[in-house]
Amino acid sequence: MNQMKIAVAGASGRMGHMLIEAILNAADATLSGALDIATSPAIGTDAAAFLGKPSGVLIESDLAKGLANADFLIDFTRPEGTLKHLEYCAAHGIKMIIGTTGFDVAGKAAIAAAAEKTAIMFAPNMSVGVNVTMKLLEMAAQNFSEGYDIEIIEAHHRNKVDAPSGTAIKMGEVIAGALGKELNDVAVWAREGVTGARDPSSIGFATVRGGDIIGDHTVLFAGDGERIEISHKSSSRVSYAHGSLRAARFLADKKTGLYDMQDVLGLR
């Protein structure tokens, strides 16, 4: 069995820990590197020290050292960090699984350009359940296109820095696409004061931040006499880690190209 040699960015964070544990427990994967910011107190420590069973892989801030033995980099960090990693990986043929959210238009364009040099999986949510939910939303939108108001409500922990979540935005894009629209043309990102009657063609967003909520998303289709709610709730980040490994397996035979979890799951 060929071993996937995988490095993890943000190795000392909560998601980094979950990814490292999943890689160490996978029969077809090897932890080959670990990265974190230069100011992290974890630099120079064993990447699996939190598990009480050292891996022999030290957390590095230098990309050349941290990625020296890697064929893949899984990155759930922040846009500015991911874009630095992206440049290095594209130049060295290292495949990337990007779960970072909050990219602007230029950042997304940089990812697309890098995909001409290496294979990239870019998805706002690696959970299999979330991505099946996306397909359900596409089907629902096609059937609730007239007479139903669409609202997307998402909740995350107090430390999440971007809003709405990347997953909520992707849900909006899927719904808008199913209706033959562009999300930016119909999205209402917030409401305050005297807003007037609701535009029936709009897609509304509401954001909640608090506690340790990992990620809850509900899409409401509200019609006359009935409401349909399609929800996904994350109880552990382990689903993101398992989805990331599934994404790496999908990329294993790809040289270049930009993919998302819909490709992995055959939901196109």
UniProtKB/Swiss-Prot annotation:
Q: What are the binding positions for (S)-2,3,4,5-tetrahydrodipicolinate in this chain?
A: 157, 166-167
Name the pathway it acts in: Amino-acid biosynthesis; L-lysine biosynthesis via DAP pathway; (S)-tetrahydrodipicolinate from L-aspartate: step 4/4
Major location (coarse):
cytoplasm
Q: Which PROSITE patterns does the record match to this protein? A: DAPB
Q: Name one GO cellular component term.
A: cytosol
**Any keyword Transmembrane helix?**
no
- Family of the protein in this entry: Belongs to the DapB family.
Its name, as the record gives it, is 4-hydroxy-tetrahydrodipicolinate reductase
Instruction: Please name the source species.
Output: Herminiimonas arsenicoxydans
